[in-house]
């Protein structure tokens, strides 16, 4: 239809119409041709948006052809408005006339809508651009903070001490400081002065190299802070010694910390000089990337994409490593200065007229090592002993200590080599080799392409963004402030030391001494656990307000991945796992709501985790009231969640499920909770796949079943059957009869679980005995220690025998692996192999060589890796290490595949985590990757590799393989569950 109305896509366009003399109505002219046109898109209601409002257009209708749809007026001046050659008879029939509105042709509406779409796209583009700018700004800010945390930590601590000193002098704030902070503040200035005096002393180069190398490589204040915090940190970490740490350990740790700080300090000082030597004409834009980054010391390390260049500069100018000898010598001298300057004072008794009790905070003493049976050689070792007054307040003020290698605020650097990846500036290594130079050389010598899958897997694990679950942290803080001792938290009070009675009976005195030793040992363990809890909580407190953070990962020598931060991480206890959650939230969805309920039931445990999925769902439905009460009133309600095996994780699941159930649309509720899928005795699963044994495969859920098969319960039933049989025997003939009677009704799943779990990892009889002994101690039914020991010995033998009966094929594979390792080790060679992902592994079991060095504090005996292998250790450790390398490969393969599928993924060896809505997809992936892994000729490749490496040696033939079909794993619902 022709139209003279002007149209512009602009919203401000003006509609101009020809003025008409009088009001008129518009009617459709009926014509035979109109029927065709009425069906065209120009009059179709679907050709124009119904919601779009357009102005009515008044149009001149001169020179309109008869075949065209026309709108005319029925006014008196009709002839003045319209001049048609031929008007149909029905035109002036008012009964057939219909009132309508003008509609534009399709090209007009199309043009209008296109303009709207263009504008919408432009707006979206601008918004995306602004979001990207904001994202970059946010990332740059976080990167600045991360770099500062890695490079200025010790310097900030120095400034804090100086500020506290000033405030103390001006405002007398000392009484308000935490106990340990007071101690450290009191030690800081005397130690700083002693170090400064040592640095300025006119000693010969030879003397300094012998007793205090590199002591002048850092400012005295920074070195003082490092010594104090490192030593206190070692004391808080706990260990075998009570209130003390071995000199060798402390000296080397302090020396390493100083060396790392020296590298950063020297680098920053050098860049300050570069800044001064720059010409005035050189513009800001022409400055080198390195100089821009380093301007105003670490504050200049904020420019995006500049850290790589800085790392290269540091790498190119780094001196060689000091070595353990130098680290130990420097550490010993600094420890000596601390023991000479640090004092502690008992609180003054106002009523007593006595001088203040001031004594050294630390003492250097020697202890006698445990004697070897049958040997008269007495070995002594030096320790730094801490005064009880220092210990008294340590576990309550751990938060004052500096913790290195905290989670990162930005994603870690991608791995590109042995020492290229992880933290931005802190030394980061792909593998924890513990000084094994052979393992380091093996990893460094591998082409980058061969290690690509390993790098990608570690990058995937490191790119998972976490955050602190504040609701769980608040509950933990409330319990901890109240003294702990519930929900698995350690008691904050020591057990009382028994007092000596007035009896002169020698046996009573001996019994009292034994009880005192036991109480002190318990208190020592409680102290260590309290320090560990405080370390975890201190990290959580620092991170609770962060939008998210990341865990750089690296490997142990077998290829298992671990977060580099040691305290608050998802591989740790229920406390840590409950506090942590994914930073990214995703809607639950229908399947996610189901998996959340299953997850909650599994965390509650108590046998519920071994039920089928439907039974677990029914368990949750039957406890909805308890779940809602736990979420709403975790500490003041009926506290149902405290009965769970993993209470804090269970509480987190209760809160998430409560949010969903309260919502009008549960499936759309956003969930941040990681849902776990755990392997069923994963070590035996790998052995069953290697040996293709159908019976073992069914026992560990490689085969579909109506409910999960429980290998631990199966072994417990076998052990109980054997013990009951022995209990009816004559004690005069079989001495185990009395022990069997003692153990009746004490054998359950928990008693044997740890031994069964570790049996495939090479647990020895001694290890099994200690595991079972701990479980029997927990039951508390056997008071006599000697009887407890003999009962544990008997139960361990029976458990290992039951395992051998059920898993004969796995035992055969373990024996073959051990025999191959023995053949190699007898040639004084370590066992080497390459994992399916291309990671080279060298077993680090060598006889150590003692290396004696003289320090200012004492003569130290450092141990280093020798040339002779430990044959027995090489043989016994190879089967579990090999299986660990396989489960590590499976986890890394799954991680990369989940990343490619768009899933968030976290792995804990044999436990894989993702969002609730993605569990089904992750389950499919992890099964596919398991089948893919064991479709490879793993044992055949291993034997071929051994034969190529040692052509002169004869290896035993491969163990026989069963007929289990690996693809059955794809259909097994409880393979991981």
Curated annotation (Swiss-Prot):
Active-site residues, Swiss-Prot/TrEMBL: 678, 753, 910
GO cellular component, one term: chloroplast
Transit peptide: 1-71
PROSITE patterns: RNA_POL_PHAGE_1, RNA_POL_PHAGE_2
Keyword Calcium: no
Protein name (record): DNA-directed RNA polymerase 3B, chloroplastic
Listed EC numbers: 2.7.7.6
Pfam short name (any one): RPOL_N
Catalytic activity: RNA(n) + a ribonucleoside 5'-triphosphate = RNA(n+1) + diphosphate
GO molecular function: DNA binding; DNA-directed RNA polymerase activity
Subcellular localization(s) per the UniProt record: Plastid, Chloroplast
Reported function: DNA-dependent RNA polymerase catalyzes the transcription of DNA into RNA using the four ribonucleoside triphosphates as substrates.
Matches recorded under InterPro entries: DNA-dir_RNA_pol_helix_hairp_sf, DNA-dir_Rpol_C_phage-type, DNA-dir_Rpol_phage-type, DNA/RNA_pol_sf, RNA_POL_N_sf, RPOL_N
Family listed: Belongs to the phage and mitochondrial RNA polymerase family.
Any one GO biological process: mitochondrial transcription
Gene name, Swiss-Prot/TrEMBL: RPOT3-TOM
Keywords (A to Z) from UniProt: Chloroplast, DNA-directed RNA polymerase, Nucleotidyltransferase, Plastid, Transcription, Transferase, Transit peptide
Native source organism of the sequence: Nicotiana tabacum (Common tobacco)
């Amino acid at each position: 239809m022709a139209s003279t109305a002007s149209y512009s896509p602009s919203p401000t366009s003006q509609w101009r119409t020809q003025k008409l003399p009088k009001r008129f109505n518009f009617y459709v002219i009926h014509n035979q041709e109109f029927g065709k046109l009425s069906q065209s898109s120009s009059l179709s209601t679907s050709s124009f948006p119904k919601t779009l409002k357009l102005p009515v257009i008044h149009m001149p209708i001169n020179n309109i052809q008869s075949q065209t749809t026309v709108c005319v007026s029925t006014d008196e001046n009709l002839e003045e408005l319209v001049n048609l050659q031929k008007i149909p008879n029905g035109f002036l029939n008012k009964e057939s006339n219909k009132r309508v509105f003008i509609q534009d042709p399709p090209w007009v509406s199309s043009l209008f809508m296109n303009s709207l779409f263009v504008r919408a796209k432009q707006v979206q583009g601008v918004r995306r651009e602004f979001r990207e700018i904001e994202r970059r700004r946010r990332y740059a800010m976080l990167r600045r903070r991360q770099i500062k945390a890695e490079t200025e930590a010790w310097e900030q601590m120095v400034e804090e001490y100086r500020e506290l000193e000033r405030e103390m002098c001006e405002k007398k704030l000392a009484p308000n400081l935490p106990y340990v902070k007071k101690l450290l503040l009191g030690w800081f200035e005397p130690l700083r002065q002693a170090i400064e005096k040592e640095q300025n002393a006119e000693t010969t180069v030879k003397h300094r190299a012998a007793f205090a190398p590199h002591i002048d490589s850092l400012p005295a204040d920074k070195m003082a802070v490092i010594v104090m915090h490192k030593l206190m940190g070692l004391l808080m970490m706990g260990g075998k010694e009570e209130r003390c740490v071995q000199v060798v350990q402390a000296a080397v740790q302090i020396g390493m910390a100083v060396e790392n700080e020296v590298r950063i300090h020297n680098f920053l000082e050098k860049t300050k000089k570069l800044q001064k030597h720059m010409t005035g004409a050189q513009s800001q834009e022409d400055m080198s990337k390195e100089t821009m980054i380093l301007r105003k010391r670490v504050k200049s390390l904020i420019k995006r994409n500049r850290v790589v260049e800085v790392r290269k500069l540091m790498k190119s100018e780094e001196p060689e490593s000091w070595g353990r000898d130098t680290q130990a010598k420097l550490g010993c001298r600094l420890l000596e200065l601390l023991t000479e300057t640090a004092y502690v004072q008992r609180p003054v008794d106002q009523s007593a007229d006595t001088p203040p009790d001031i004594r050294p905070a630390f003492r250097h003493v020697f202890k006698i090592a445990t004697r070897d049976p049958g040997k008269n050689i007495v070995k002594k070792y030096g320790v730094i002993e801490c005064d009880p007054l220092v210990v008294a307040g340590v576990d309550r003020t751990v938060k004052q200590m500096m913790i290195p290698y905290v989670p990162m605020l930005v994603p870690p650097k991608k791995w590109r080599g042995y020492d290229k990846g992880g933290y931005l500036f802190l030394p980061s290594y792909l593998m924890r080799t513990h000084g094994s130079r052979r393992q380091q050389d093996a990893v460094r010598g591998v082409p980058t392409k061969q290690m690509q899958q390993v790098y990608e897997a570690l990058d995937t694990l490191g790119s998972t963004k976490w955050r602190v679950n504040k609701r769980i942290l608040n509950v933990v803080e409330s319990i901890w402030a109240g003294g702990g001792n519930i929900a698995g938290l350690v008691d904050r009070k020591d057990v009382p030391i028994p007092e000596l009675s007035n009896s002169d009976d020698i046996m009573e005195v001996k019994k009292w001494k034994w009880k005192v030793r036991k109480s002190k040992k318990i208190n020592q363990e409680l102290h260590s656990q309290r320090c560990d809890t405080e370390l975890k909580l201190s990290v959580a407190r620092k991170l609770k307000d962060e939008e998210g953070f990341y865990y750089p990962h690296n490997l142990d020598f077998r290829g298992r991945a671990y977060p580099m931060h040691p305290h608050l991480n998802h591989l740790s206890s229920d406390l840590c796992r409950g506090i942590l959650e994914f930073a990214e939230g995703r809607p639950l969805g229908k399947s996610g709501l189901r998996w959340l309920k299953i997850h909650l039931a599994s965390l509650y445990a108590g046998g519920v985790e071994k039920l089928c999925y439907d039974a677990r769902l029914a368990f949750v439905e039957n406890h909805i009231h308890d779940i809602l009460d736990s979420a709403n009133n975790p500490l003041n309600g009926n506290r149902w969640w405290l009965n769970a095996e993993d209470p804090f994780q269970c509480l987190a699941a209760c809160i998430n499920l409560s949010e969903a159930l309260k919502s009008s649309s549960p499936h759309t509720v956003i969930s941040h909770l990681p849902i776990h899928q755990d392997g069923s005795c994963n070590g035996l699963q790998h052995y069953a796949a290697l040996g293709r044994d159908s019976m073992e495969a069914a026992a560990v859920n490689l085969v579909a079943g109506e409910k999960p098969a429980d290998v631990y319960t199966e072994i417990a039933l076998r052990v109980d059957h054997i013990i009951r049989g022995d209990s009816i025997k004559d004690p005069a003939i079989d001495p185990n009869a009395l022990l069997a009677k003692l153990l009746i009704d004490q054998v359950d799943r928990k008693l044997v679980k740890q031994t069964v779990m570790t049996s495939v990892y090479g647990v020895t009889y001694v290890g099994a005995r200690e595991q079972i002994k701990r479980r029997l101690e927990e039951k508390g039914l056997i008071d006599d220690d000697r009887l407890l020991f003999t009962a544990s010995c008997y139960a361990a033998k029976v458990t290992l025998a039951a395992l051998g009966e059920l898993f004969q094929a796995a035992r055969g594979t373990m024996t073959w692996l051990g025999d191959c390792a023995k053949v190699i080790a007898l040639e004084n060679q370590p066992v080497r192999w390459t994992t399916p992902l291309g990671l080279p592994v060298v077993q680090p079991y060598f006889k150590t060589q003692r290396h004696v060095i003289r320090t200012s504090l004492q003569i130290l005996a450092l141990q280093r890796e020798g040339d002779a292998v430990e044959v027995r250790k090489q043989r016994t450790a190879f089967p579990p290490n090999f299986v660990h390398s396989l489960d590590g490969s499976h986890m890394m393969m799954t991680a990369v595949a989940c990343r490619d599928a768009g899933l968030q993924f976290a792995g804990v060896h044999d436990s894989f985590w993702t969002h609730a809505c993605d569990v089904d997809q992750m389950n499919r992936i992890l099964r596919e990757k398991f089948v893919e892994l064991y479709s490879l000729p793993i044992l055949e490749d291993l034997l071929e590799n051994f034969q190529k490496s040692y052509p002169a040696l004869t290896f035993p033939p491969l163990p026989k393989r069963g007929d289990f079909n690996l693809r059955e794993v794809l259909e097994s619902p409880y393979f991981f569950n």
